[in-house]
Amino acid sequence: MESLQSRLDSFLKTKRIKKHSSKSSSTSASVKWPHPPTFKATASTLSEAGFYFDPSWDDRDSVACFLCGKELSDWDADDDPFDIHYTKCRNTCPWAVVRCGLRDDVDEDGSYIFSNKTRLPSSKIMEKARLGTFKGGDWWPHDAIPGHGACSKKMAQAGFVYTPQISGDDTATCLYCNLSLGGWDKDDDPL
């Protein structure tokens, strides 16, 4: 679920859920995302905020973060997925820090303002959060190649977060300038 498209697709497909009522029987149902497009929590906003659709029998609108695993449900019309993810997970989830918290760093004109120094792109906290989007190198394909110039540590230092379009892709994005680059070669240096 690390790719935006796979998270978005999770909202577009019908999900099969089961209710286990006893050891010998269970009931199942098919569910789709239950809320209308007038809600702030749409497939698009939830996916961008890091969530995929993960319903259960008791929580038909349950979502989970692809990175920290936080599960949220019972969405109301005015619930903002970015604000809620950042508020609940800013101390534990790299995606909440770098992507969802970014909205607090922009003023009405779209200019960046950093009232909190820890939110500066050059801060160690932000660099660590960006590195966390590469999932400790488990997802970033170039960390498995010794001496690769575009290792996850250098990518995070350069301001990139991992934003694969499909599983295994090496697309990384600078969220401050919206520059996405992929196809990293061994000799590339993101710095």
Region spans (language model):
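Intrinsically disordered, low-complexity linker/tail regions enriched in polar/charged residues
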Residues: 1-191
